[in-house]
Regions:
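Acidic, metal-coordinating helix/loop segments flanking the phosphotransfer/catalytic sites
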Residues: 27-44
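The feature encodes the CheY-like receiver
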Residues: 52-53
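Charged docking surfaces used in two-component/phosphorelay signaling
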Residues: 15-23
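Alpha4 helix (beta4-alpha4-beta5 surface) of REC/receiver domains from two-component response regulators
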Residues: 58, 79-97
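Hydrophobic/aromatic residues positioned on beta-strands within the core alpha/beta folds
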Residues: 73-78
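Conserved acidic carboxylate
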Residues: 8-9
Length: 120
């Protein structure tokens, strides 16, 4: 079963993403603070790159250092569809997909399938 780690400060969003991805058959671990350790080996990390308490790009680099081979999907309310600069900056940090909030379950699942494939 593919493992996904979600890094998101907002509890409601963490819970919603966990529910959506678990229903698709993924094993999900959600954390609020971005402290993703070596024991959190994952097939994918979904990270909110804008959090008020931490600089998103710095946190992304820290998580990547702990999980160097793991692909990332970045989510944020700061991205705007069609805003090339945000996508370019995120991809320069090694992010495979960028999703602007608010997004639908369908959009999230499509991005996850694109990066790691379906759970079954």
């Amino acid at each position: 079963m593919p493992r996904i780690v979600i890094v998101e400060e907002d509890k409601l969003m963490r819970d919603l993403l966990t529910e959506w991805l678990s229903a698709e058959g993924y094993s999900v671990r959600a954390v609020a603070n971005g402290n993703v350790q070596g024991q959190d080996k994952a097939d994918l990390v979904i990270v909110d790159v804008y959090m008020p308490r931490r600089q998103g790009s710095n946190r992304l680099r820290e998580i990547q250092a702990a999980n160097p081979q793991t692909p990332f999907i970045a989510i944020s309310g700061q991205f705007r569809p069609g805003l090339a600069g945000s996508c370019t900056a995120a991809r320069a940090l090694g992010v495979r997909q960028v999703i602007a909030k608010p997004f639908s379950r369908r959009e999230l699942i499509a991005a996850v399938h694109d990066v790691i494939g379906p759970a079954h």
